[in-house]
Amino acid sequence: MSSRKRLLDYLEREKYLRTKKVRKAMEEIDRENFVRSSDKYLAYDDTPLSIGQGQTISAPHMVAMMLEVLDLKCTDNLLEIGSGCGYHAAVASRMVSQVTTIERIRYIYELACENLLEFDNINVVKGDGSCGFIDNSPYDKIMVTCGAPNVPPPLIDQLEIGGLMVIPVGGRVAQELLTIERTFHGISVSRRPGVAFVPMIGTNAFES
C-alpha cells in the first residue's frame, strides 16, 4: 500500500475525508512535490511541515477538513488567503473553475509561483491577503489558511451572496475555525474550536 493511500484511508476513517471528490483531488496532487527535499519522507504523515520564513504546509487532515466544509463546485471562483507552498490551492484547483491565491511574503510567493506553474486555473498574487483581491471578485468560496484576529471586512464584501468562507479567527497561536455563509440578510457563522495556524499579517489583521 502506498504512503499516500495509507494517509487518505486514515483521513477517511477519522471522518476528515467524507466525499469522493475531495479524496480524488488529494489523490491527484503529490504532497511530496510541495515540501522541502529534506522532508519528503514526511510528506504523507498527517503533520504540518515548515516551508521557510516561519510558514508551514498545513497538515493533510486540515486540508481535507477545510475543503469538505467549503463543498467546492466545478463552477466555483475560489479565493485563497495565504498561498504557502501552493499545495492547498493545487488540491482545490481540481474541484473548481478558478483559484486566486494571495501571498504577502516574497520568498513564499515565488515558491508558490514555481510549484503552481503548470496549473492553468490558478492565479498567484503577491499582496495583503487581509484586503482580499477585488479584481477577481466576487468569490463563491474563500479559504483562509492563516489566523486572523477578526474576520477582515473586505473578505465579507468580496464573498458572493450564498457563498462560504472558512477562516481561523483568534490569537496569533490558537484559533477557532469559522465557517461563514453570506446571505441577503448578513452572515451566519458556525465554529469549530482548537485549530492552530500561522498569523495573518496585514492592514485588516495582525501587525508584523
Residue ranges and their predicted role:
Residues 1-79, 87-91, 95, 108-118, ...:
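Class I SAM-dependent transferase core
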